[in-house]
């Protein structure tokens, strides 16, 4: 079992060094947030996904993806203990791994989907630490092993933390924009209804006076000629 594990560790180490891989370190039992920045204009209208790399040339098995409707990408979607949310205006894809476990360690990808193809936004190597106070000791790393092997990898400041139950993150830019659009639409609709009601009134028309007694002003009383001579 140990030789097999050593081979896996060496494989992941070489793979992470060959690519521009970012290392995210998390503590077992806590939550880890992974951020993947991207060009919001280039990837406008595209769904995003989080997948796990299977082998050097194997496929990247999808773990979770954003909402099928791109406009709702800001909504958090869960698959087991993994969540994904996309700030399409800010250009940041955020993945949350809740209750981090040793088997969660490994190589992942943030992807931008277009049709049947996918562009890699960032390669991520997740490390699971046994003790946050002793994370520099290689013996406390479940995966992938010694830190000296990641000379070419960029270590992100992403030590995991416990999420409080009452903690509510600030809404992303997409939510604020959606609320602003809804508010603007309501204002425009109210203005249109008010304008239609104002134009519907006919200026200069007055209700009939009580002195008319119901007679048509076009008819007048005339004296008969025979009655005038008598």
UniProtKB/Swiss-Prot annotation:
Expressed in the brain, specifically in microglia and in the fusiform gyrus (at protein level). Expressed on macrophages and dendritic cells but not on granulocytes or monocytes. In the CNS strongest expression seen in the basal ganglia, corpus callosum, medulla oblongata and spinal cord. Disulfide bonds join 36-110, 51-60. Residues 19-174 are extracellular. Glycans are attached at residues 20, 79. One of its GO terms (biological process) is CXCL12-activated CXCR4 signaling pathway. It comes from Homo sapiens. A 1,2-diacyl-sn-glycero-3-phospho-L-serine binds at residues 67-68, 77, 88. Monomer. After ectodomain shedding, the extracellular domain oligomerizes, which is enhanced and stabilized by binding of phosphatidylserine. Interacts with TYROBP/DAP12. Interaction with TYROBP is required for stabilization of the TREM2 C-terminal fragment (TREM2-CTF) which is produced by proteolytic processing. Interacts with PLXNA1 (via TIG domains); the interaction mediates SEMA6D binding and signaling through TYROBP. The keyword Glycoprotein applies. Changing residue 157 to Y: Accelerates ectodomain shedding but does not alter the cleavage site; decreases cell membrane localization; decreases phagocytosis. The chain crosses the membrane at residues 175-195. Forms a receptor signaling complex with TYROBP which mediates signaling and cell activation following ligand binding. Acts as a receptor for amyloid-beta protein 42, a cleavage product of the amyloid-beta precursor protein APP, and mediates its uptake and degradation by microglia. Binding to amyloid-beta 42 mediates microglial activation, proliferation, migration, apoptosis and expression of pro-inflammatory cytokines, such as IL6R and CCL3, and the anti-inflammatory cytokine ARG1. Residues 29-112 form the Ig-like V-type domain. The record marks 157-158 as: Cleavage of ectodomain. GO terms for cellular component: extracellular region; membrane; plasma membrane; plasma membrane raft; semaphorin receptor complex. The keyword Membrane applies. Changing residue 162 to R: No effect on protein expression and maturation. It is linked to Polycystic lipomembranous osteodysplasia with sclerosing leukoencephalopathy 2: An autosomal recessive disease characterized by presenile frontal dementia with leukoencephalopathy and basal ganglia calcification. In most cases the disorder first manifests in early adulthood as pain and swelling in ankles and feet, followed by bone fractures. Neurologic symptoms manifest in the fourth decade of life as a frontal lobe syndrome with loss of judgment, euphoria, and disinhibition. Progressive decline in other cognitive domains begins to develop at about the same time. Alzheimer disease 17: A late-onset form of Alzheimer disease. Alzheimer disease is a neurodegenerative disorder characterized by progressive dementia, loss of cognitive abilities, and deposition of fibrillar amyloid proteins as intraneuronal neurofibrillary tangles, extracellular amyloid plaques and vascular amyloid deposits. The major constituents of these plaques are neurotoxic amyloid-beta protein 40 and amyloid-beta protein 42, that are produced by the proteolysis of the transmembrane APP protein. Residues 196-230 are cytoplasmic. This is Triggering receptor expressed on myeloid cells 2. Keywords: Alzheimer disease, Amyloidosis, Cell membrane, Disease variant, Disulfide bond, Glycoprotein, Immunoglobulin domain, Lipid-binding, Membrane, Neurodegeneration, Receptor, Secreted, Signal, Transmembrane, Transmembrane helix.
């Amino acid at each position: 079992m140990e030789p097999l594990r050593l081979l896996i560790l060496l494989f992941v180490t070489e793979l992470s060094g060959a690519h521009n891989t970012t290392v995210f370190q998390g503590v077992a039992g806590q939550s880890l947030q992974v951020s993947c920045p991207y060009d919001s204009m280039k990837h406008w209208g595209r769904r995003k996904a989080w997948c796990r790399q299977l082998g050097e040339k194997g496929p990247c098995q999808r773990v979770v993806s954003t909402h099928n409707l791109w406009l709702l990408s800001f909504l958090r979607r869960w698959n087991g203990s993994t969540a994904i949310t996309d700030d399409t205006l800010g250009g940041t894809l955020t993945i949350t791994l809740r209750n981090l476990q040793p088997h969660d360690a490994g190589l992942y990808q943030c992807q931008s989907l277009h049709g049947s193809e996918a562009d890699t936004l960032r390669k991520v190597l997740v490390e699971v630490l046994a003790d946050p106070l002793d994370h520099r000791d290689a013996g406390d790393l479940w995966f992938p092993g010694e830190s000296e092997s990641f000379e070419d990898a960029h270590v992100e400041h992403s030590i995991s933390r416990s999420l409080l139950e009452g903690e509510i993150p600030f809404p992303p830019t997409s939510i604020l924009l959606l609320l602003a659009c809804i508010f603007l639409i309501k204002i425009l609709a109210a203005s249109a209804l008010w304008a239609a009601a104002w134009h519907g009134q006919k200026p200069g028309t007055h209700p009939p006076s009580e002195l008319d007694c119901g007679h048509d002003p076009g008819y007048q009383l005339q004296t008969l000629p025979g009655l005038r001579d008598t």
